[in-house]
Amino acid sequence: MMMDPDSAKMQDYSGWSFGFHMPPTSSTNLLPQSMPDDLSNGPDSPDSTGKDGKKNDDRVKRPMNAFMVWSRGQRKKMALENPKMHNSEISKRLGTEWKMLSEQEKRPFIDEAKRLRAIHMKEHPDYKYRPRRKTKSINKKNGAPIPFGNLDTKTPSYPTLTTNWNATNQYIDQFRFAPYPTTTVMDQIPFSLTYPVHSVPTDNSSPSQFQPSPMSTNFAGSYLTPKSESSPVGSDSTVGTVDSSQFRAYYDHTKDQMMYPYSIELTHAQNIQNALSQSHVTS
C-alpha cells in the first residue's frame, strides 16, 4: 500500500517521545484551592460556614422574638404544603397570619421569646446588636444598570424645532434683516416715487414741458432729440441742429446719475483752471 510522503513524515514525527506535546498551561497544573471563609460569607453573617461545614460560632445570634418562635413551625408546614412557593412569599403570608392572631393566641409565643431572651443575656452579657451593613442597590432604569446612583436621570429638555417656514423667517429677519413692508405701507407711498414715469415728447409738445422728475433715474428717453414745433412730420426741415438752450432745458447732465461722477470731476477741473487764470491776472 502506497502512502503519501507527507503523511509518512507526520507519522514518524508522532512516534517521537518529544513530538507534538503541548506544555502544561497555567490552568491545567493548578490544584483546586478552597476560598477563604472570610471572603465567602464573612464573620458577621449568621449563615457563614467554616471549613468543616459548620456555622461560625464567632457571630452571636440575635435572640428570637415572638414572631420567629411562632413562624419556626409554621414555615416548615407551609413549605411542605407549597413546595414551589418562594421563601419571600412564605414570609409574607406568615406575617399576614401573625397580624390576624389575637393577643391570647400570641401570648404563649411572647412568653417563650422572653424566656429565650433571658437565657441569651445570661450567656452573653456583653452582647450588642450589630446589624449587617447592607450594600447600596444600584439604581436600574428599564432593566439596564446605572453605574452611579446619584446622577440625575431626568431627560434634558431641548427647545423644540418648528417646521413652520414663516416662523423661521421671522426669527432670521429679527436679527439680520428689516421686516418687509406690508401692503398698507406700500399703498401709502406715492406711485411716482416707486415707479417713475417718463413721458415721451410728441410733435405737438415743446421740449420744456418734459422735465425729468426728481426721483427719476431712468434716462432712456433723455437723449431723444426734439423736433421743431413748426415743422410738419416728414418734412425736410426736421433735419438740422437744435438750439443749445432748448437742449439744456430738456436735458441736464447734472441730474443724470450715470454722468454724475464725471460732472463732479469736470467741475473740479474748471475750478482749478479758473483759479490758475486768476492767479496769472493778479500777478
Swiss-Prot record:
A molecular-function term among this protein's GO annotations: RNA polymerase II cis-regulatory region sequence-specific DNA binding
Localization: Nucleus
Regions of compositional bias (Basic and acidic residues) in chain numbering: 49-61
Stored PROSITE patterns: HMG_BOX_2
Chief subcellular location: nucleus
A single GO cellular-component term on record: nucleus
Name of one Pfam family that matches: HMG_box
Record bears the keyword Cell cycle: no
GO BP terms: brain development; IRE1-mediated unfolded protein response; negative regulation of transcription by RNA polymerase II; neuron differentiation; neuron fate specification; positive regulation of transcription by RNA polymerase II
InterPro entries: HMG_box_dom, HMG_box_dom_sf, SRY-related_HMG-box_TF-like
Residue ranges of DNA binding: 60-128
Biased composition (Low complexity): 205-216
Keyword field: Differentiation, DNA-binding, Nucleus, Transcription, Transcription regulation
Record function comment: Probable transcription factor that regulates the lineage progression of embryonic blast cells and controls the postmitotic specification and differentiation of neurons. Cooperates with additional factors to direct the differentiation of the olfactory neurons, functioning with the transcription factor ceh-36 to specify AWC neurons and with the LIM homeodomain factor lim-4 to suppress AWC terminal differentiation and promote AWB neuron differentiation. Plays a role in the terminal differentiation of glutamatergic and cholinergic neurons.
Self-association and partners: Interacts with egl-27 and ceh-6. Interacts with ceh-36 and lim-4. Interacts with wdr-5.1.
Identification of the protein by name: Transcription factor sox-2
Organism: Caenorhabditis elegans
Organism taxonomic ancestry: Eukaryota, Metazoa, Ecdysozoa, Nematoda, Chromadorea
